[in-house]
């Protein structure tokens, strides 16, 4: 549907989120009919609050996906550490690998709990801008660190398509 004063000028190609189109939009002399105002008549003047509320849920979504990525990387590292042998035993039995896996599991659990807490509070109708932002920050950084450590546990094999951690 087109509205006077709104134009779509450019589709933006992205590295991820390919299932959701992103476009560049311009608003020139655009007026929103009262029937299209978010929240109906009562929503007039509250657009900023509604937009910020959507950002909170988006941050929880990013945190949730980050926890999923971290979980997959951790599980791949755990499987590999149990299957790969050096010096006649699984690398899982080497203390350095155990320490690394324990650190990964701790970061993963902390990210999961922060994300659950933000989601639970949002579901209860609470304002969660701080909690959602903290969960997004911590979970996304944890996912990067856990994926990096999973690659290190795999060694050179982590860079081959033979193992899922390469993704």
Residue ranges and their predicted role:
Residues 142, 146-149:
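Amphipathic alpha-helical coiled-coil segments
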